[in-house]
Amino acid sequence: FGFGFIEVGTIPPKSQLGNPKPRIFRLEKDKGMINRLGFNNDGIEVVSKRISDNFPNGVLGINIGPNKNTTNKLEDFIFCLTKIHEQADYITINISSPNTEGLRDFHHKDSMKDLLDKLNKLKKLKKIKKPLFIKLSPDIKDSEISDIVELIFKYNIDGIIISNTSDSTRERLTDSKKKEKG
């Protein structure tokens, strides 16, 4: 036995420290965790080299997202896909993190349409054949689900990854750390 695949990321274009520590909280009473990592890593260029130098054979997924302080999240996704697609067996487009302000706005129909349209055009232009997965929030509103599904089919997204940290289920928790952001 072993791992069927490995996914690395979320990797943004530029290096960033992520959120201040502590970033992970164990909720012992609730048998759960809260995280607020904030995509802490060395950025797409350094991670790409690290993958080239160190990754053995096997299935590799690469999860991409925008920098926390970017002025254009959409362009960050385009930049990362352009830089990393040759090294990945599949690419995950992470729009699920509650720890990157405004990232979950891509769940709204017009924003998701813009994102998927640009990614699709880039795939055609660069002849990218790698599967694209989209990582969704567990806090999607019922009213958004049909629009999201419609766009996923329209743009031939290959897979869906659910989920990430939820912001909406805290009222059931009993641990004293339940109010930590993440």
Residue ranges and their predicted role:
Residues 4-8, 35, 60-64, 91-94, ...:
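Hydrophobic faces of well-ordered beta-strands that scaffold small-molecule active sites
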Residues 98-111, 151-182:
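Glycine/Thr-rich beta-alpha phosphate-binding loop at enzyme active sites
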Residues 1-5, 36-46, 71-85:
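Glycine-rich anion/phosphate-binding loops
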Residues 11, 65-69, 96-98, 135-139, ...:
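Active-site beta-loop-alpha junctions enriched in small/polar residues
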Residues 44, 48-52, 78-85, 109-120, ...:
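Generic structural signal for well-ordered alpha-helices
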Residues 66-78, 105, 111, 133-153:
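Active-site glycine- and acidic-residue-rich loops that bind
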